[in-house]
Amino acid sequence: MIALRLEGQAMEIEGTKFGSITIDRKTYEHDVVIRLSGEVIKRKKKLSKKYYGTSHVLSKDEAKFVFEKGCEQFIIGSGQMGNVHLSPEAETYFAKKGCKVLLQPTPDAIGVFNKSHAKKIGLFHVTC
């Protein structure tokens, strides 16, 4: 299911626990990506899993899927225990796009996302 947001409407990530994240009073029981528009979509983990056998390494293919022109910040919630990280190719991709990457455990990344006024995209891993 895709949640849409009205232009200029503030989004709030209320919290996370192992296996879920709550955004604007809706709980998602899977990893999510929050687009520049505020649209919440399911993360396409298979784009990374096909290369690394795990979704804990973000591939260049997944980076290309997630990135949108105009994005200033890519905030990654790396899981409850911080297991997700970028592949070297994904790091290079975001650097070439001029997009600052902030990677923190999901509970901390939520606070960063909520406080940021940048044009941002979020990816939140909800398990380990």
Label every PLM stretch briefly:
Residues 110-128:
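Short basic, glycine-rich beta-strand/loop surfaces that mediate nucleic-acid
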Residues 2-49:
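N-terminal, charge-rich interaction modules
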Residues 61-62, 108-112:
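Short acidic active-site motifs
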Residues 100-110:
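A short glycine-rich beta-strand->turn/loop micro-motif centered on a GG-aromatic cluster
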